[in-house]
Amino acid sequence: MQPNSILAKAVRFALISGAATAALSASAVYAADEDSVERIQVTGSRIIREGAVAPTPVTVISGEELLATGATNIGEALNQLPALGNTYSLANSGRSIGTAGLNVLDLRNMGTARTLVLVDGKRHVSSSAGSQRVDVNTIPSTWVERVEVITGGASAIYGADAVTGVVNFILKEDVEGLDFSVTKGFADDSSHSKEKLSLSYGTDFDNGNGNVAFAIEYAGQDRLRSLDRDQTAISFTELRNQNQQPGSVDPNDPDKILTPNAGYYAINNAGVFNLDGWKTFNPDGSIRDVYTGSNVDGVKCADCDSFNLRQFSDLQPEFERYNINFKSNYQLNEDMQAYFEAKYVNSQSTDYGQPAFFFGSPVTVKRDNAFLHSSLQDLMDEKGKDSIGVRLFTNGLGQRIEDDTRETQRYVLGLKGYIGEDWEYDTYAIYGQTDLERVNKNNMIKKNFANAVDSIMVNGVAVCRDLEAREAGCVPINIFGEGNVTTDARDYINTVSTGTSVIKQTVLGGTITNSMLYELPAGDIGFSSGVEYRKEESRQNEPDNAEGTFFNVLGEDSGEYDVKEVFAEVNIPLLADLPAIQQLDLELAARYADYSTIGDATTWKAGLSWQLNDELRARSTYSRAIRAPNIGELYGALGQNFFNVDDSCKLDNLNDLTPEQAAVRKANCAALGVPSDFNSDYDSASIEGLSGGNDQLKEETSTSYTIGAIYQPDFIYGLSISADYWNIEIDDAISSVSAQNMIDKCLDSSTIDNIYCKRITRDPNSGEITSIVSQSLNIAKLEAAGVDLDIGYVFDLYNGDVNTNLVLTHLLKRNEYPFQGETDTYNEYAGYVGEAEWQANLTAQYSKDNWGVYWRTRFIDEVSLYTPQELEKNPNPSNNTSYGKYFISDASVSYSFENGIKLKFGVDNLFDRDLPYGTTGTGAGSASYDNVGRYYHATFSFMM
């Protein structure tokens, strides 16, 4: 390429900014060329300021650092940063329907919808229906130059959704040469393995005026089941402390004891029923008493006939991904360059769930059932029963399986260049589309199952009782015992249902920038402005038979919106070359947006950068950001869901309250028809209900500010220290009132005539909750604050280079107010599982001649499994109230041959650090902990 002088400066700036090989300081990077050494700042701004700095805190991760461990997907590496939560990592992506295989980012654990993900500062199509959540695994890791993680509201500069911050992937502009790499890894104590293969090639053409490149990437991993590892194969359950002193509130005398080899005895694969005591079926269908042992709590027990639910759970999903990327640019003349990018990504993930089950609503079995063993018939006759209710997992019908296939394509076409000596422009058009196919296998047709279970004997042959069903092909099923389900019965009851989603994004935009707009005594004014039009579309289709199957019905929904935006940013040098004020700059930014859904919205930002001397700089920002409701929140149809609740009308729960609160709740429970002695055995039961969108939603608004400093002492060359305090507050946060909150709000009101009670349905006879309806509302408030510390030190050692870096986050506050008007009612999550008060990554690299050594240690502070509010209500809920301090280390060594070949061998989780006691590492919070164990990996790469 043949850039003019201004372009050369910009390219030089970009190259140096991404030159370091570790997670770099949020403040500065030392970079060297043959003639001089200078400090370079990554700005988190659209204004290029070579040799200057900006007030926004930015953490930079180089592309090489992303590939340093055995991670085969970008998301795996990024989710280990202290600033990011593990809300949707690959390990826990299957916990929601339709999300298996996704890896989306969540800055500050304030919601994936509030983190804006960009590629080269531009929007990227979503991978999740109804949202703007970007699957970062679709980004080609081979071409990543660096990743900028920007803290705080950045809507004024980058647009809506940047409420908690921005993650901006900067790709290599010109790709030259061949880069081939293959990685293979396997776990130490299981058959789990991963692999990755990438090939990239780029070349200049037309005497350097153009560049063309392509990249192909494959990544895959095996399924890892809980039963595949000794530590996670054991079932843990909290049981009542039988030795607790009456009325004890002593944490050393807890209510519950986390107990291994424990679980429910009232359900299993063979079938369980309660008739003059709990009984289960032998494999042949005969019956026996359930052995509950001596440690019993409701329908749970230990060292007994408990059922291990972990036989159905996975630690890692089966996953494959194929990426094809193409890019090209051509210098049309000295001041104009055309560029084009295209990508296609196909990812496939398989999530294994529990079989269809019947617990709260048992299967009704009649006395004359064709498969009923004579021993049970005799017992029913003795007790005068015509039918019984059987609780079971229908394991004979197979585990429910969800195969998710995503196809993502994205195209970018643009012109950029220079007008005169000082003005730089970039105009672009983007189209992106994601197609999702969700195939649900072993999906029970509930009506067919009911017909098949209700069988009778006719002329010595088992047939379905219902004549119409029999004529339609009904095949009777024997659910008693194990191994008795025929293939014909399975085929009649199960179906394969397929749901599809299509997400589309269209963007037209342009920016114009002048880093030297006007010269002031203190320096040049920098200016950037732009316009953008964006259209988002999403459509989700359910299969025709979804309504009558066991899989959750998500509901069909579709919607679209567009937004027109104009924005501007200016950097004004105020003072320079004064005592204690080497440079003082003011940054201002504003954006006006017109949405087809919510109407007008304005965001802004102000920042101050104060360079005291060559060694010390202070910085601060204050901003207002918004997040417009996404398509799913606006137009999501009411779909089937399941809510985990503990009914507040239970006598045990009422007895834990103050007399005044108990009196109000008892009166409302009675008014709802709940018996006064109601005390369901099913604590934390899963209640069926509906959840969906609300087209009356408005935008969320946030205010955030940061205050920080950067210190680069002259007396320790290569050392850079930055510390930033950040504070984020979100009002009118879009939230569905939790099912538990809805129950409590219903019962704590003066009467049952309120919006919460109207959304809850109870059985008129038993008083049990049978259904809950939840919709999104602008009802919540979120706030978080913390301190980020970033220390980088580069130095020489024994004729080699050492690059060390410490990235640390101290979380001071993370509060959620379910109802923003009730400021005294909130949950504190700082220090809660997944949101440790202290988190840190320490990396060190040593390179000498052709050798390279890498080390990383991650630290997660002790976390609580209960919020302070929960412990205030009950200070001794369990003997397992926290996970201890967690250290995990990775190491690798590499050797580069003169012919371009490089070999690398590494071990992740070098010391085989176990998971915290009782967890599987697949929850939204516990996914921070490694569930694979010690993992060996090797990489062969070749560059020329």
Question: Where on the chain are the PLM-derived regions?
Answer:
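Short loop/turn motifs that connect adjacent beta-strands in outer-membrane beta-barrel proteins
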Residues: D33-D35, E50, D174-G177, S190, ...
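Short acidic/polar hinge/loop motifs at secondary-structure boundaries
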Residues: K122-T151
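N-terminal periplasmic accessory domains that precede
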Residues: I74-A77, N103-D106, D135-N137, D161-V182, ...
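C-terminal beta-signal and terminal closure region of outer-membrane beta-barrel proteins
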Residues: V439, K447, S623, G636, ...
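N-terminal Sec signal peptide and the immediately downstream disordered periplasmic leader
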Residues: M1-P82, S198, G202-D204, N241, ...
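Surface-exposed, low-complexity loop segments enriched in small/polar and acidic residues
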Residues: L224, D230-L239, T280-R321, N325, ...
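Extracytoplasmic beta-strand/coil segments of soluble accessory domains associated
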Residues: E50, L78-R123
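C-terminal beta-signal and adjacent terminal beta-strands/loops
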Residues: I445-K447, L812-N815, T857-E870, S894-M944
